[in-house]
Amino acid sequence: MANLFNWLPLLSGRQADGIKAKVEIYTWQTCPFCIRAKLLLWWKGVKFIEYKIDGDDQARQAMAARAEGRRTVPQIFVNDQGIGGCDQLYGLDSRGQLDPLLATPPNPA
């Protein structure tokens, strides 16, 4: 599905040049909130790491450990910091806080 939406940043005129953050998202394939969150990330030209955890209880437990116990999908991490799910992602965007967050490079380990 990722290839299907690769044209979105080109259509919108958005370039991924300013995106330096490491973005990770835990998803289920048929989850509408996951699809909506990925659509916003694609629209912005974000290259993200997707963990598809459909039916994988061990992966879901690992996600919950990172997400302060939250077990719902999607769970989105920017530079290893949990930002929550789809609603939180769109909230950051509507408040103008998502783009600066995406422009922040990850801290070197």
Curated annotation (Swiss-Prot):
GO molecular function: glutathione disulfide oxidoreductase activity
UniProt entry tagged with the keyword Electron transport: yes
CDD domains: GRX_GRXb_1_3_like
Matches recorded under Pfam families: Glutaredoxin
Disulfide bond entries: C31-C34
The Glutaredoxin domain, residue ranges: 11-109
GO cellular component terms, A-Z: cytoplasm
Domain of life: Bacteria
InterPro entries cross-referenced by the UniProt entry: GLR_AS (IPR011767), Glutaredoxin (IPR002109), Glutaredoxin_subgr (IPR014025), GRX_bact (IPR011900), Thioredoxin-like_sf (IPR036249)
Keywords: Disulfide bond, Electron transport, Redox-active center, Transport
Example GO BP: cellular response to oxidative stress
Similarity comment: Belongs to the glutaredoxin family.
Functional note: Has a glutathione-disulfide oxidoreductase activity in the presence of NADPH and glutathione reductase. Reduces low molecular weight disulfides and proteins.
Name under which the protein is recorded: Probable glutaredoxin slr1562
